[in-house]
Amino acid sequence: CEDTRVTAKLLARYDIQKPLLVYHAQSGKLATTRVLSLLGEGKHIALVTDAGTPGISDPGSALVAEVRERLGDDVRIESIPGPSALTAGLSIAGVPTNEFTFLGFLPHKKGRQTLMKEIADMSRTVVFYESPHRIEKALAELDTALTAADMPERKVTVMRELTKLYESVVSGTAAELMEHFKAHPTEVRGEFLVIVSP
């Protein structure tokens, strides 16, 4: 699990009493080695994420890759999907979903401007995650890229806290959404999903 406090609440809710092993982006090889050892002993392991589906923009994907590489077909990996902002957002956005590009979290600095230009040039739905600290900057960069590509009217949908108590969805151009968040600073909290229409 990423955070024992979060996972412990879930397990307590269903009266499940099992030992927890922390695994996150900074866990390093020690946690991976422990998981491989437990699997080698025939133990069953559950990969639990704090939010969303394990392995989707989540450090769990590296663990699954390592298990597959080291143990191959000797271990059975099953998916029990949880809520995912990616699929939940696409299902209510009203955009083409037969073909889309998912970028996960955008880089903080290096390559970000180039990526925004690539997003503007894509002719399919584009989806990415953004943090509350960078959502306004992302919308400004997206507006610049779409304007440079002569597509400033392209529809953008920003979804916040999907499947949670303070869920909200706003749509418009990138420029309109920038104004929206400036006018509603209390909405610049939580986890964001950004969907750019083709």
Model-based region annotation:
Residues 1-78:
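Class I S-adenosyl-L-methionine
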Residues 4-5, 22-29, 83, 103-108, ...:
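Short, acidic/turn-prone active-site loops that include or flank metal/cofactor-
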